């Protein structure tokens, strides 16, 4: 029996990263991890820095980093509108490690000119990128 599929678009302000039929997606929503399958109840929710794990037709997997945005689920389709979206294999581990180090330093050494909320957001994004890099390496 063939797996049930639905259409998925993953787009950012810069470009469309993915468009096609998928069996399932996993995305980090504002309330936690979401698993979306064919026939999912319609939904519109914010997504936080993290990954979109896509299981394409025939079980092939792709992982995309998103810095935030929204996911909309409709009967037969889903759309991820991301602030920034980068394929896992296109992420730079050295840059992500450096961004993580800088954010941690800014949080620890708070000065009047450092915005704690911005530093925490930068840290969350860097950690999410490193997680996507690790998962991409494992899925190869």
Swiss-Prot record:
Cellular compartments per GO CC: plasma membrane; proton-transporting ATP synthase complex
Q: Name one GO molecular function term.
A: ATP binding
This chain belongs to which protein, by name?
A: ATP synthase epsilon chain
Q: Which domain of life is it from?
A: Bacteria
Known Pfam families for this protein? ATP-synt_DE, ATP-synt_DE_N
Q: How does it sit in the membrane?
A: Peripheral membrane protein
Family, per the entry? Belongs to the ATPase epsilon chain family.
Function as written in the Swiss-Prot or TrEMBL entry: Produces ATP from ADP in the presence of a proton gradient across the membrane.
Assembly, in brief, is: F-type ATPases have 2 components, CF(1) - the catalytic core - and CF(0) - the membrane proton channel. CF(1) has five subunits: alpha(3), beta(3), gamma(1), delta(1), epsilon(1). CF(0) has three main subunits: a, b and c.
Q: Where in the cell is it found?
A: Cell inner membrane
* High-level lineage: Bacteria, Pseudomonadati, Pseudomonadota, Gammaproteobacteria, Vibrionales
What main location does UniProt list? membrane
Q: Where does the record locate the signal sequence feature?
A: none
PANTHER family recorded for this chain? ATP SYNTHASE DELTA/EPSILON CHAIN, ATP SYNTHASE EPSILON CHAIN, CHLOROPLASTIC
Alphabetical UniProt keywords: ATP synthesis, Cell inner membrane, Cell membrane, CF(1), Hydrogen ion transport, Ion transport, Membrane, Transport
Q: Which species is listed as the source? A: Aliivibrio fischeri (strain ATCC 700601 / ES114) (Vibrio fischeri)
């Amino acid at each position: 029996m063939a797996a049930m599929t639905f259409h998925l678009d993953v787009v950012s302000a810069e470009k469309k990263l993915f468009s096609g039929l998928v069996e399932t997606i996993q995305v980090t929503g504002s309330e936690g991890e979401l698993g979306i399958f064919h026939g999912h109840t319609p939904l519109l929710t914010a997504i936080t820095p993290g990954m979109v794990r896509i299981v394409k037709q025939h079980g092939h997997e792709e992982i995309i980093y998103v810095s935030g945005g929204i996911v909309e689920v409709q009967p037969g389709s889903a759309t991820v509108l991301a602030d920034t979206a980068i394929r896992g294999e296109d992420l730079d581990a050295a840059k992500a490690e450096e961004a993580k180090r800088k954010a941690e330093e800014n949080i620890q050494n708070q000065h009047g000119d450092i915005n704690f909320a911005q530093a925490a957001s930068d840290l969350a994004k860097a950690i999410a990128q490193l997680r996507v890099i690790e998962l991409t390496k494992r899925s190869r």
